[in-house]
């Protein structure tokens, strides 16, 4: 997985794409362990401070529909957090998609265990837009089945690009957060509220 991790890190830094046609079968991740090996090398090569985490495909329904075997994690770096009123150049985030998300601000070290549930109401919750991205030449990635594409996504920084943090959702634990509306302006056109 060394070649994949190194080439993905270079693609991130140089804003280029990785053509998987130049990879042998044993250089493509076939399971999560191999995907994480490439991902960890990617992070070592970049040497950037982690300020948060993104976790994609959290819902079991999404995992089943996409043919995934679990969620798709990735780190958030300081320079990838954007303010809510910003401009984005598509060339800086290739093959991107916009996804409405929530972002927790966790201002203390926590273990992911039963105690986390006791502390979760103390955390701030924000609206967010995750701008997913890919550093692969898409035609070279699309030839693989959905599960291998997921492993390639994990290796590729969890398909991470940038994230826009919106407004804090006050009293989030007492309201139906699934009914929150966002407004998004693309090329000076306001989208429909979702």
Pin down the residues of each PLM region.
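Catalytic-core "active-site belt" of small-molecule-metabolizing enzymes
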Residues: 2-194
């Amino acid at each position: 997985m060394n070649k994949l991790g190194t080439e993905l890190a270079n693609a991130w830094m140089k804003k280029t794409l990785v053509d998987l046609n130049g990879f042998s079968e044993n250089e493509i991740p076939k399971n999560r362990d191999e995907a994480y090996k490439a991902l960890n090398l990617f992070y070592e090569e970049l040497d950037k401070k982690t300020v948060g985490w993104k976790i994609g495909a959290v819902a079991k329904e999404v995992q089943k529909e996409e043919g995934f075997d679990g969620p798709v994690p990735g780190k958030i770096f300081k320079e990838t957090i954007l303010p809510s009123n910003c401009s984005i150049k598509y060339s800086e985030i290739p093959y991107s998609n916009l996804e409405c998300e929530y972002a927790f601000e966790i201002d203390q070290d926590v273990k992911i265990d039963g105690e986390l549930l006791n502390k979760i109401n103390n955390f701030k919750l924000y609206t967010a837009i995750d701008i997913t991205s890919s550093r692969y030449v898409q035609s070279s990635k699309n030839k693989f089945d959905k599960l291998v594409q997921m492993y390639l996504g994990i290796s590729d920084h969890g398909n991470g690009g940038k994230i826009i943090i919106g407004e804090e959702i006050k009293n989030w634990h007492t309201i139906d957060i699934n009914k929150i509306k966002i407004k998004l302006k693309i090329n000076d056109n306001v989208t429909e509220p979702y």
